[in-house]
Amino acid sequence: MMLADMKYDWNQNEGRTLVDGYSRGVAVGEKIMMAHVKLDEGAITKPHSHDYEEIIYVVSGRWRVEFGERVFILEANQSVVIPPFVEHSSVAEADVLAVVATNYRPEWANNQDYWLHYNAENHLWAV
């Protein structure tokens, strides 16, 4: 990684829209990464799990994160830690701005995980 690649300005980089209602910009290191996530109200993440942990910090909005029957409603200045191999899903109950920290994830760095956020039944975000 070059020194010039180490600074990220979220005001200059709005991120990439993966599907309608979900955009993400990423700051990528060699072993860790951080995502600046914007979700429109009603945006979903389908149930899934992965072999790394993830920490979500909500800057603004209201994000419902579900672990089976256990539910966390995250609002501004609240976080949740998602352990490895724990199935989870989510719904934005209001427009959300959040920061997600995780291990390096090639599918995020290359914007190849859009299918997690796509509702094939409607071809739009579930509401």
Please annotate each region the language model reported:
Residues 1-31, 115-127:
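A short, N-terminal "cap"/entry segment at the start of jelly-roll beta-barrel domains
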Residues 19-20, 35-49:
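Conserved short histidine dyad/triad with adjacent acidic residue
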Residues 84-109:
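Ligand-binding loop in jelly-roll beta-barrel domains
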Residues 59-60, 75-76, 94:
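A cytosolic small-molecule/anion-sensing beta-strand core signal
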Residues 38-40, 50-65:
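Short, conserved beta-strand element in jelly-roll/cupin
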Residues 46-53, 86:
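Histidine-centered catalytic micro-motifs
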Residues 69-84:
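Short acidic-glycine-tyrosine-enriched beta hairpin
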